[in-house]
């Protein structure tokens, strides 16, 4: 049970920053594309 909770917490700790970075990167790329047009 404790291992399961730790695994889930680890997933959140890893996925949340990765998701935020990915989202920011995508927004940046879209902004650059719009600026070029």
Curated annotation (Swiss-Prot):
InterPro entries: PetM_cyt_b6/f_cplx_su7. GO terms for molecular function: electron transfer activity. One of its GO terms (biological process) is photosynthesis. It is found in: Cellular thylakoid membrane. The chain crosses the membrane at residues 5-25. It holds the Pfam family PetM. It comes from the Bacteria. Keywords: Electron transport, Membrane, Photosynthesis, Thylakoid, Transmembrane, Transmembrane helix, Transport. GO terms for cellular component: cytochrome b6f complex; plasma membrane-derived thylakoid membrane. Component of the cytochrome b6-f complex, which mediates electron transfer between photosystem II (PSII) and photosystem I (PSI), cyclic electron flow around PSI, and state transitions. Belongs to the PetM family. The 4 large subunits of the cytochrome b6-f complex are cytochrome b6, subunit IV (17 kDa polypeptide, PetD), cytochrome f and the Rieske protein, while the 4 small subunits are PetG, PetL, PetM and PetN. The complex functions as a dimer. This is Cytochrome b6-f complex subunit 7. The gene is petM.
């Amino acid at each position: 049970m404790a291992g399961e909770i730790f695994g889930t917490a680890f997933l959140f700790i890893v996925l949340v920053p990765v998701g935020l970075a990915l989202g920011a990167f995508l927004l940046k790329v879209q902004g650059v594309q719009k600026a070029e047009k």
